[in-house]
Regions:
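Short beta-strand-to-loop element that shapes/binds the nucleotide-sugar donor at the catalytic cleft/hinge
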Residues: 134-148
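Conserved N-terminal catalytic core of the sugar/cofactor nucleotidyltransferase
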Residues: 1-8, 16, 30, 34-118, ...
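Conserved donor NDP-sugar-binding/catalytic core segment of glycosyltransferases
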Residues: 123-133
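A structural signal for short hydrophobic beta-strand segments in well-ordered beta-sheet cores
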Residues: 28, 149-151, 201, 210
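Conserved catalytic-core motifs of eukaryotic protein kinase domains, centered on the activation segment
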Residues: 19-22
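Short, well-ordered beta-strand micro-motif
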Residues: 30, 137, 150, 178-180, ...
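Short loop/edge segments at beta-strand edges and connector loops
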Residues: 56, 80, 107, 135-137, ...
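Catalytic-core segments of class I nucleotidyltransferases/pyrophosphorylases
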Residues: 102-104, 111, 117-125, 141, ...
């Protein structure tokens, strides 16, 4: 898929992972010895995404230091939010970066392994006509803790239920989306739109295609799910793990705390 640009939402506070996130942002929590954000950027790199924006808020200095590594220069850019803008607000604030191109919008605090080439290809060539968004979905064993979608025979979202007590199924929103430029334009024209799940998705019901991830998809917002992720098969790393940033991080008290908590 040509010209798609990525926005990785990585600025969250990670309150459910405290005390880990008191000294480390959630996006730098390690899985298989590598920061979560590095896993995401590796997936983009492998699939030819050459422009990516990462929003930053919590533990700004640590994230900016991570993004200053050589392998991210010229294609990954951090943007600091003194006050969090909301999942849709960040997209609106940075619309110029996307230059009227499709946007790969990623909630980068989840642990995801999938065939991104298939996801990108589905959006480009196979999504039903009349749709402007492709939502990655997955089957969850905890539907009350997820946003659950109802789809028609073509896989188009007809209804969406955000963390309700008795959801109608287990097909969950994976919080990874491909957006056509008209979606970004709609958000950009409406300053009151801050949240993607509660404001954008309801407006575009009937125009959201779905692609089901058959691989791994976890919300690692709780310690037990983060521990479970350590046992998942790990993808091959894209870059040298012995660079100066990695060596510094491994010697940092934050890293030792993470290792101690996850052992």
């Amino acid at each position: 898929m040509k010209d798609v640009r990525a926005l990785l939402l990585a600025a969250g506070l990670g309150t459910r992972l405290r005390p880990l996130t008191r000294s480390c942002p959630k996006c730098l929590i390690t899985i298989g010895g590598r920061p979560l954000l590095e896993h995401w950027l590796c997936a983009l790199y492998r699939n030819g995404i050459t422009q990516a924006l990462v929003n930053i808020h919590h533990h700004r200095t640590l994230v900016e230091s991570f993004l200053a590594r050589n392998q991210f220069q010229g294609w990954v850019y951090g943007v600091y939010e003194p006050q969090l803008l909301g999942t849709a607000g960040t997209l609106r604030q940075n619309r110029e970066f996307f230059e009227n191109e499709p946007v790969l919008l990623i909630h980068a605090d989840n642990w995801c392994q999938c065939d991104f080439s298939e996801f990108l290809g589905f959006h480009s060539h196979q999504r039903p006509s009349g749709t402007s968004i492709t939502m990655m979905t997955f089957r969850t064993s905890s539907p009350t803790a997820c946003g659950i979608v109802e789809v028609d025979s073509k896989g188009v979202v007809q209804n969406f239920h955000e963390k309700i007590e008795d959801p109608p199924g287990n097909l969950a929103n994976g919080a990874v989306y491909l957006l056509e430029p008209e979606v970004s334009a709609w958000i950009g024209e409406r300053l009151f739109v801050k949240d993607f799940s509660t404001q954008v998705i309801p407006h575009f019901l009937g125009r959201i295609a779905t692609w089901e991830n058959q691989g791994i998809h976890r919300d690692i917002g709780m310690i037990h799910s983060l521990v479970a992720a350590q046992s998942d098969p790990q993808p091959v790393n894209c870059w040298d793990t012995a660079d100066s940033w990695s060596r510094a991080f491994e010697s940092h008290p934050v890293h030792h705390q993470l290792v101690g908590e996850l052992d």
